[in-house]
Design a protein with these regions (language model features):
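Short, well-ordered beta-strand segments
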Residues: 3-5, 72, 90, 119, ...
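Short, structured active-site "lid" loops
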Residues: 45-71
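Residues embedded in well-ordered beta-strands
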Residues: 88, 101-103, 193-197, 252-254, ...
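N-terminal basic, low-complexity leaders that serve as flexible interaction/assembly modules and, when applicable
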Residues: 313-355
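A conserved helix-loop-strand patch within extracytoplasmic ligand-binding domains
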Residues: 76-79, 85-136
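Short, Asp-centered acidic motifs that coordinate Mg2+ and/or phosphate
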Residues: 69-73, 158-159
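Small-molecule-sensing regulatory modules
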Residues: 1-37, 43-50, 131-310
Length: 355
């Protein structure tokens, strides 16, 4: 019996089940799902807490290294950019829809009334919402797909932004009010892709390779090279999306402060013949983002009283523990607004535009 480690959520078990079915056919051997609790499953602790890097994957990897399971399946966007010694991503199956989507009681993003509460705990999504609809209130919500949809249905929030792949995999695609285009919200690096991981010396490695989809691997390699190149943490508002067609990889990436005001966006394309080319393209885009973004963000991040945001990495947002009010003209922002930001303790910041 092949033991496949998975998180316990419906989405995790569903996508792991897809891999398990395919692996069982290839190996002509039964596959058993082994549910493993991860630190990230504790929704009472913010994902941006210092102890949380790799919160959704560390326990799975520990079980793999200990020999408790033979293979694990991750949502690829949850993997830290640094490789894990002794482990390999043996397969990246065909990617599911990569976009972000809106679940809403009031139609599309443009239709939401001013002041509507939009739920997300993703800095990337919050920053994009702040850029394109600064009159909305972005509030942190966590939980599985059903939980977040439920918060919309009960009125706790008016809308929520989720990954399309998750809704499709659990059969909730009918809940989608709008597929948000990459011109508004560039997906997270590797969003919609799965990472099938095993030990480097595993006899299953060759079998798992048959599940690999080359265009998906090339795209994800470029996207994650952007992530590594900007040394992004889980709280960084970064997006990257690559598409591979007829030997050419097109890559779009963006980077923002948490308020969505300081903003950099880069588009590059290159002919690729292998993973090294894809990695090089991602590294080039990362350098271009940092080069383009630094002066723009420094100019945009002034406050109404003449002070500036905290020093350090210019692409990270405010980190103060007390309410702040700042006036932004906004790079690529559709509206002028007075911004109020509140961050309580280690929770994600909440932003509201005040006219």
């Amino acid at each position: 019996v092949i033991r496949l480690g998975t998180r316990g959520s419906l989405l995790a078990r569903t996508q792991s089940g897809l891999v398990a079915d395919a692996l069982a056919r290839l190996a002509d051997e039964p596959v058993e799902l082994v549910v493993i609790a991860t630190e990230g499953d504790d929704t009472s602790v913010p994902l941006d807490a210092p102890s949380r890097p790799g919160a959704f994957v560390s326990a799975l990897r520990d079980a793999l290294l200990a020999g408790s399971v033979d293979v694990v399946v991750h949502s690829f966007k949850d993997l830290p950019s640094a490789p894990a010694p002794g482990l390999v991503v043996a397969a990246i199956p065909l990617r599911a829809p990569h976009a972000d989507v809106l679940v809403s009681r009031a139609g599309a993003l443009a239709d939401l009334p001013a002041g509507a509460r939009v739920g997300t705990s993703s800095p990337r999504r919050a920053a994009a919402l702040a850029r394109f609809r600064p009159d909305l209130a972005v509030v942190p919500i966590r939980g599985n797909v059903d939980t977040r949809i439920g918060k919309v249905r009960t009125g706790e929030v008016d809308a929520a932004v989720l990954a399309a792949a998750g809704l499709h995999r659990v059969g909730r695609q009918d809940e989608i009010a709008e597929v948000i285009g990459a011109d508004v919200l560039v997906p997270a690096p590797a969003q919609g892709a799965l990472a099938v991981e095993c030990r480097a010396d595993s006899p299953l490695r060759a079998t798992l390779a048959a599940l690999d989809d080359l265009p998906t691997r090339l795209a994800v390699t470029a996207e994650r090279a952007v992530l590594a190149g900007v040394q992004a943490a889980c709280t960084t508002a970064i997006g990257a999306l690559a598409t591979w067609t007829d030997g050419r990889l097109e890559l779009t990436a963006d980077l923002s402060d948490h308020a969505g005001v300081g903003y950099a966006r880069v588009n590059r394309g290159a002919h690729v013949t292998g993973l090294a080319d894809a990695d090089a393209l991602g590294a080039e885009v990362a350098r271009a983002l940092l080069s383009q973004g630094t002066p723009t963000l420094r100019q945009a991040q002034g406050s109404s009283d003449g002070s500036s945001l905290p020093t350090g990495h210019p692409l990270l947002g405010p980190t103060a523990d007390s309410p702040l009010i700042r006036s932004y003209r906004g790079v690529r922002t559709r509206h002028r607004a007075i911004w109020m930001m509140r961050q309580a303790g280690r929770s994600l910041p909440e932003y509201r535009a005040v006219r």
